[in-house]
């Protein structure tokens, strides 16, 4: 990782806010409406609020933060949300607001969980989607990690990518505010970064085509990633690829690729 290990000597608290917005799309082929609904039910169960809570708690630990409060909710007919409030330093119990549950026993006790940080937070929302006239279903996960102080959400990128079936990924990272060194000089960013890709493992990047759109003077960084290879069996829901004729395999693969390209581009092309 670049730049995160080199620290400034600051005056007072680090007032920089670092926000990572992470969206992944999982694409699946399910021909009939029945199969599409079954896929949505499957993905909804796979990524319910319990599992999402564990993922976010792992992210919190990876970036060196501590959970103050967790709230979670599963929705009907589908979808889930988890919100975690986090703190950079572990707080003595007498300083923690009595409304904070610290994430203890939440999964076993309640249907809704919210995690709360004193100055930072982690949230996730899921968006399953299908249309009866289209044999391709999609599942989007929207994760936001916002931190204040020295901790950086960039440390959790590889884990987040690996936690989901990530066909298309869009990542936004921005730094806001300023902090001062001991001599009073203002700093608007406290680590080196030229691209979000600098914080993604090379083995992960090999699997994707990636492009950057960065506004360096505004400390705004944007990366989009599109999976290179389509292993068709991985995209068929409850169907064996060997049941398909070669012509069908090619047609389905092309349709999957077209859907991915449109999502990656953010526009209707075909």
From Swiss-Prot:
Catalyzes the decarboxylation of S-adenosylmethionine to S-adenosylmethioninamine (dcAdoMet), the propylamine donor required for the synthesis of the polyamines spermine and spermidine from the diamine putrescine. Is synthesized initially as an inactive proenzyme. Formation of the active enzyme involves a self-maturation process in which the active site pyruvoyl group is generated from an internal serine residue via an autocatalytic post-translational modification. Two non-identical subunits are generated from the proenzyme in this reaction, and the pyruvate is formed at the N-terminus of the alpha chain, which is derived from the carboxyl end of the proenzyme. Pathway: Amine and polyamine biosynthesis; S-adenosylmethioninamine biosynthesis; S-adenosylmethioninamine from S-adenosyl-L-methionine: step 1/1. Belongs to the prokaryotic AdoMetDC family. Type 2 subfamily. InterPro entries: AdoMetDC_fam_prok (IPR003826), S-AdoMet_deCO2ase_bac (IPR009165), S-AdoMet_deCO2ase_core (IPR016067). This is S-adenosylmethionine decarboxylase proenzyme. Keywords: Autocatalytic cleavage, Decarboxylase, Lyase, Polyamine biosynthesis, Pyruvate, S-adenosyl-L-methionine, Schiff base, Spermidine biosynthesis, Zymogen. GO terms for molecular function: adenosylmethionine decarboxylase activity. Its cofactor is pyruvate. It comes from Alkaliphilus oremlandii (strain OhILAs).
